[in-house]
Amino acid sequence: MKPFEFGLLGVRKRRLFLAIQLAASLLVWTSVTSRGQSIPIEHFIFIVQENHSFDNYFGTFPGANGIPAGAALPDYPGGPLTEHPILAGAKQPDFGHKWIDSKLCYDNGAMDGFFWAEWPEAERYYAKGIPVPTPDPNLVVKLNKTSSAVPAGTASKKNSAPKSTVESKWDPVMKEYVSPNGFADEEDPDDPDVGPKNDLLGANAGPTPPPIKDQPPTLKYTFSYLDDTVIPNYWKYARSFTLCDAFFSSMGGPSLPNHLYLIAAQSGDLVSQSGNGHWIYYEFLFPNIVDLLGNANVSWKYYVGVSDPSLAYIWDPLPDFQKYETNFQIAPHIAATDKFYQDLTQGTLPQVSYLIPSIAKSEHPPQDVQGGMWYVTDLVNAVMQSKYWSSCAIIIVWDDYGGFYDHVPPPQVDTHGYGFRVPALVISPYSSVGVVHTTYDFTSLLKLIETKYNLSPLTSRDANANSMLDCFNFSQTPLPPVIITK
């Protein structure tokens, strides 16, 4: 059989496989929790990278639910299946990955809209009638920050320094706002997901379809994949430890809402992150995991790869929770990445750690993914060479699909998600070696530490999530470190 060659029988087999996979995940979860098994992990390290789908990174990994044989996509709805997967290099274009983009790609479960979602007029034409949720005003406060004023009531907030946002400049190559601190806002200032341009998605949607000829040469990379020649370290981790092939982003859309799910099991109905030419400044009123950790005396730290880690941005929304506005009590818990290495060597690593990259090391297109891969590898090597290896679990995830193709329709557990699959690696002496097919999302990370420390769930999302316990085998002989060097 030729690469990617399959037919209707293959589709039916794949659907049967997915059904069996879901049933098995529920059985595994029940068996693990019913045993009341203790968890000999004392340090959880969550490394969060950027913007790649599962099929983009592991679509050809042996044993994983990867790119189907014969996979092909149309350039426009109802068009011929003329586009096929291509092997990409270390640098890929940045594709749209807003709420609307994800809905266009999803196409009611057909998973065939990745090309037409990228046309400049696609949102105006094809997105007509797609509802866009608005933030719950009881959970999210939206304020416009301009160059002339800081929103009232935020002057005492450590992260309210206007230079962090008002000096951000639109980078036409990266298609992002990039600030002096090195972070990016992934959405165009004319983002129709928010603000007065919402009417583009309703009765006033554009009457003319996108062109179907002369597509940009970079567009083909939305249907691309990488292999072990491009990201060899990640593939080595996948072979040596655990690869999850049913790990979904928590909602369809960009970074900020998914990072909120990562720490709070909700986004307050927020599905976007900026628009209308102004930096949109949010304050969040709902609880998050660090509240639970603090109340339970579980140590934690957020390590951030920017010049001032206390500044809130789309990959680190913690400083923008309203409860920290006048009393920035979480300041000792937010540190630069260098502090992570110090904590490893000084024996002061907290029980729960999050690692958020700089833009250069994030793998966010068009950044070189190998630069991000080696940043992650250095972190993993440092843990493996420390005293913490014997008692740790390192979980590496990517925060959203980045506009890249994935063939698995995400389960629609509520109006917000799941979003598309993203890669997830579990690296631990107790990793269950191989591919785990259990369904997870970012709230599964919350469920894991809630289970370990007997914490109450934050929302129904983490209450109902699988906790990733079946990624571990606590009765096995502990696995040795796998040190990777250049």
Which residues does each PLM region occupy?
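N-terminal secretory signal peptides that target proteins for export/translocation
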Residues: M1-K13
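Exposed boundary/loop context
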Residues: P3-E5, W29, Y237, H437
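Basic polycationic patches enriched in arginine
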Residues: R12-R15, R35
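Bacterial N-terminal signal peptides
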Residues: F17-W29
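N-terminal signal peptide c-region/cleavage motif recognized by signal peptidases
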Residues: S31-T33
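N-terminal pro-sequences and low-complexity stem/linker regions of secreted or lumenal proteins
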Residues: R35-K486
